[in-house]
């Protein structure tokens, strides 16, 4: 197994241009596919999850051209639904942002489509989405365990009508349903059961749909109306914002060991909720400065916070490791959906924080972290989870440094993360 040793870092300073957002990249690729016209996507993320989406689209007959560095994609929309005369089997790795939307999109046309993935994907739930699609007439069969991939879609189109979908596990299910609703055979009225998690991710979806000419009526996140007769029209160009979750590591670095760290590609005009991570750092005592498309974090003594972070679940992970450098006990609440991500992130985070000496209480949907008097060095397991690797890079700011096991797992969203991280040192 590959290991990366991060030696103690005394101070960080510098500027990082954040790679494109994973959430926006895969949503935009699918909408561009369903749209009429050619779309040029710039600052597209070049990572495993996006490659899985692109490979699947190519297999389904979608034509696109990638720049040499894979960050500009010119894609010819099919102007409607995806159909296939022959049975197709698509491998989607561990990319939830490809599996969920494609599962929904492939019900719209005609054909037989089988969706598979890595072993961890077979443990990540999709039942809430499938239940909703079945209410609109979709024929979807589980191939192993009910409620989980792999699955086969026998597509004949999607009916309009009223549909209920659970919102308390993952917002990706609602996102997938919203994106396909305009191409159903009638108007779609979506009722959300339970409290909707990660609302800002739904805002991203609706904003992108609007860019492609489709209007969603949002009734306070409890009901969504998509009127029949709409279609996606390419806006010509789509700029993919920097990934706000990826920005969180550099902002935390600035807060803990700044110096001054500036991230560009996200800022006050961002459509991503995860930029609110900077507000949490500010509550902890960091000096934060906002621009339209940048955020600056400067170092300052940090104190613990006790907050509901359901609205920023991915970026909240960075608070868990930043908490090791804050005075007092930090509590991160309402984060049950950490458990259904690339790994069970609540269990993984608790395990690895204890390795470095933290006192940790792991609840069903919260984590309580008290830093040790002295942080211990350790070998951090990353569970094939990109965010675990990036979060624990913060331990380079301890006097003893840290060792990261399987550092290349960052390829899911940020292949050159550790190179960029190293550029801030000195």
UniProtKB/Swiss-Prot annotation:
Record keywords, A-Z: Amino-acid biosynthesis, Aromatic amino acid biosynthesis, Cytoplasm, Transferase
InterPro entries per record: Enolpyruvate_Tfrase_dom (IPR001986), Enolpyruvate_Tfrase_sf (IPR036968), EPSP_synthase (IPR006264), EPSP_synthase_CS (IPR023193), RNA3'P_cycl/enolpyr_Trfase_a/b (IPR013792)
Active site, UniProt feature: 314
Pfam families named among the record's database cross-references: EPSP_synthase
Molecular function in Gene Ontology: 3-phosphoshikimate 1-carboxyvinyltransferase activity
GO cellular component: cytoplasm
Keyword Cytoplasm in record: yes
Subunit structure: Monomer.
Family: Belongs to the EPSP synthase family.
Protein's name according to its UniProt entry: 3-phosphoshikimate 1-carboxyvinyltransferase
UniProt source species: Shewanella putrefaciens (strain CN-32 / ATCC BAA-453)
């Amino acid at each position: 197994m590959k290991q990366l040793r991060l030696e103690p870092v005394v101070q960080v300073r510098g500027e990082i241009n954040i790679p494109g957002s994973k959430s926006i990249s895969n949503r935009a690729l699918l909408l561009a596919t369903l749209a009429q016209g050619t779309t040029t996507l710039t600052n597209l993320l070049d990572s495993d999850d996006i490659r899985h989406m692109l490979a699947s689209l190519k297999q389904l007959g979608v034509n696109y051209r990638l720049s040499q560095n894979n960050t500009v994609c010119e894609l010819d929309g099919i102007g409607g639904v995806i159909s296939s005369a022959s049975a197709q089997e698509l491998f989607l790795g561990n990319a939830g942002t490809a599996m969920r939307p494609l599962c929904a999109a492939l019900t719209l046309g005609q054909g037989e489509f089988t969706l598979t993935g890595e072993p961890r994907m077979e443990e990540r739930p999709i039942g809430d989405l499938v239940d909703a699609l079945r209410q609109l007439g979709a024929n979807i069969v589980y191939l192993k365990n009910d409620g989980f991939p792999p699955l086969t879609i026998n597509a004949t189109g999607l009916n309009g009508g009223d549909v209920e979908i659970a919102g308390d596990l993952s917002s990706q299910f609602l996102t997938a349903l919203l994106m396909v609703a305009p191409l159903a055979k009638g108007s779609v009225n979506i009722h959300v059961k339970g409290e909707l998690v990660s609302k800002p991710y739904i805002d991203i979806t609706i904003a992108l749909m609007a860019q492609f000419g489709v209007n969603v009526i949002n009734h306070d996140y409890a009901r969504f109306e998509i009127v029949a007769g709409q279609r996606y029209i390419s806006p010509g160009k789509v700029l993919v914002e920097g990934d706000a979750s990826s920005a969180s590591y550099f902002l935390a670095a600035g807060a803990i060991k700044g110096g001054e760290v500036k991230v560009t590609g996200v800022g006050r005009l961002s459509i991503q909720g995860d930029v609110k991570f900077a507000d949490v750092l500010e509550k902890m005592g960091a000096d934060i400065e906002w621009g339209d498309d940048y955020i600056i974090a400067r170092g300052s003594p940090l104190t613990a916070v006790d907050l509901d972070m359901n609205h920023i679940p991915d970026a909240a992970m960075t608070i868990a490791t930043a908490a090791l450098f804050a005075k007092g006990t930090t509590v991160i609440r309402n984060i049950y959906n950490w458990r259904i991500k690339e790994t069970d992130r609540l269990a993984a985070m608790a395990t690895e924080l204890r390795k470095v000496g933290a006192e940790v209480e792991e609840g069903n949907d919260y984590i309580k972290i008290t830093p040790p008097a002295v942080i211990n060095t350790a070998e951090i397991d990353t569970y094939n989870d990109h965010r675990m690797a990036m979060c624990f890079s913060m331990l380079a700011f301890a006097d003893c440094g840290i060792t990261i096991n399987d550092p290349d797992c960052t390829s899911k969203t940020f292949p050159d993360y550790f190179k960029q991280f190293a550029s801030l040192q000195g």
